C-alpha cells in the first residue's frame, strides 16, 4: 500500500480590478493665432493681438516655416517644426500643471508617434494615467501604444478612440499579467491571466471576468485545474502532483465530496471517499497486477469490513472479513481458485491457522 495525504485545494478569485478611475482626459490642442502680428523683430519674433508670441523661422515676413516656439497668453507652449504656418513634424507641447506631449504633429494636431505625460496637483490617485507613448491620429490616441497607470501597472497594445481595444497586455505592479483581447477599455474576449503566484486563468473573458475557461493553481506538492462556466468556478477538479499522482474529484469549499479517482505513477489506483485529504469511508484500491481491495478505509488504510482479491477476477481467490491498519485481522474467509472456502486466522498480517469450511 502506498500512503498519500492529499492537500486541500485552495480558493481562487477570478474577478480583478483593471480599469483606471474615470476616463482618459486629453487636453485639446489649442490653435495658434492666424491674425496679423502686431509687431515683428528682425523677422524672427511675432507678437499677436491675443497676447500670444512666436519666435523662430518665418517666410514672407509672417508665415511660420522651419523651427520655432509659440506661447499662448494662457501659458501653453509649443516648440518644434512648422510647415505653412501650422505645427507639422516633431515638436513639444506643454500645458502648465496638466501635461506634456513630445512627438509628431501634422496640420497643427498630434499625429504620428508621440508621448504624453499627465501632470497632477500632488500625487495621482491609483489608476489614473501617468503617461502614454504610441500612435496618435488627428489629435487623439491612435491604434496602439503603451500607457502607464499610477500605482497599478502598464498596458501595451491596441487602442480605439482613446480606450484599450483589440489585443493588449496589462502588467500589474504586483507581478500579475494579462495577455489577450480588450473591448471598450475592459478585458473581453480570449486571453490569459497569469498571477504572480503562478496561478493561470485562461479562456474567454467578459467585462473583466473569466466567463468560460480554466483556472490552474498550485496546491501543496501539485497543480490543480478547474473549469469556469458562466463566470462561476466549477467544483470538479483535477490535481497532478509532482510524483505524477493524479486526483480527479469534486470539491465543496476546500474538501473533496463523493468519490474521487486517484491514479498513481506506479500504475495503482484508488476510487472512493476521502476525508481531510486521506482515504476514509468506502473505496476500492487496485494494484497494477490486478489485485484489489474493496471495502472500508480509515486513516488512509484498509480498516473495517472488506474483500481483498488476489487477482482481477472477483469470482475466486479472495479474502473476506475484517481489516485493520492495512492488514487482515482475526478470522476471515478465504475463497480459493477452486471456489473452496476456508476459515483463516490472521495476526500482525500473518495467517496463523487455516481450516476447511464446510458449506
Predicted features and spans:
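Generic secretory/membrane-interface signal
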Residues: 2, 15, 294-297
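N-terminal Sec-pathway targeting helices
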Residues: 3-13
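Hydrophobic helical h-region of N-terminal Sec-dependent signal peptides
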Residues: 12-18, 22
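Glycine/tyrosine- and acidic-biased, solvent-exposed loop/turn segments at the edges of beta-strands
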Residues: 20-359
Amino acid at each position: 500500500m502506498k500512503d498519500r495525504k492529499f492537500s486541500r485545494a485552495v480558493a481562487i478569485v477570478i474577478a480583478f480590478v483593471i480599469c483606471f478611475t474615470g476616463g482618459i482626459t486629453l487636453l485639446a490642442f489649442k490653435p495658434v493665432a492666424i491674425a496679423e502680428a502686431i509687431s515683428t523683430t528682425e523677422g524672427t519674433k511675432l507678437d499677436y493681438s491675443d497676447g500670444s508670441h512666436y519666435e523662430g523661422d518665418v517666410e514672407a515676413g509672417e508665415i511660420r516655416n522651419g523651427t520655432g516656439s509659440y506661447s499662448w497668453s494662457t501659458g501653453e507652449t509649443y516648440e518644434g517644426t512648422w510647415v505653412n504656418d501650422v505645427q507639422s513634424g516633431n515638436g513639444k507641447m506643454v500645458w502648465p500643471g496638466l501635461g506634456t506631449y513630445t512627438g509628431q504633429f501634422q496640420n497643427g494636431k498630434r499625429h504620428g508617434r508621440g508621448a504624453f505625460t499627465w501632470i497632477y496637483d500632488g500625487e495621482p490617485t491609483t489608476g489614473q494615467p501617468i503617461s502614454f507613448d504610441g500612435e496618435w491620429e488627428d489629435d487623439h490616441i491612435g491604434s496602439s501604444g503603451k500607457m502607464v497607470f499610477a500605482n497599478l501597472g502598464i498596458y501595451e497594445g491596441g487602442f480605439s478612440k482613446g480606450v484599450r481595444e483589440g489585443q493588449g497586455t496589462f502588467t500589474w505592479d504586483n507581478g500579475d499579467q494579462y495577455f489577450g483581447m480588450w473591448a471598450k477599455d475592459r478585458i473581453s474576449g480570449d486571453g490569459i491571466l497569469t498571477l504572480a503566484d503562478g496561478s493561470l486563468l485562461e479562456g474567454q473573458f467578459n467585462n473583466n471576468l473569466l466567463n468560460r475557461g480554466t483556472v490552474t493553481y498550485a496546491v501543496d506538492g501539485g497543480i490543480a485545474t478547474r473549469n469556469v462556466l458562466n463566470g462561476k468556478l466549477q467544483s470538479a477538479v483535477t490535481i497532478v502532483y509532482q510524483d505524477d499522482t493524479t486526483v480527479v474529484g469534486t470539491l465543496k469549499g476546500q474538501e473533496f465530496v463523493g468519490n474521487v479517482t486517484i491514479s498513481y505513477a506506479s500504475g495503482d489506483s484508488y476510487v472512493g471517499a476521502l476525508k481531510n485529504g486521506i482515504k476514509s469511508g468506502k473505496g476500492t484500491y487496485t494494484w497494477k497486477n490486478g489485485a484489489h481491495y474493496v471495502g472500508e478505509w480509515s486513516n488512509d488504510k484498509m480498516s473495517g469490513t472488506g474483500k481483498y482479491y488476489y487477482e482481477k477476477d472477483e469470482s475466486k481467490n479472495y479474502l473476506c472479513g475484517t481489516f485493520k491498519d492495512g492488514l487482515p485481522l482475526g478470522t476471515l474467509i478465504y475463497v480459493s481458485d477452486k471456489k473452496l472456502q476456508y476459515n483463516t486466522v490472521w495476526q500482525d498480517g500473518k495467517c496463523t491457522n487455516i481450516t476447511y469450511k464446510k458449506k
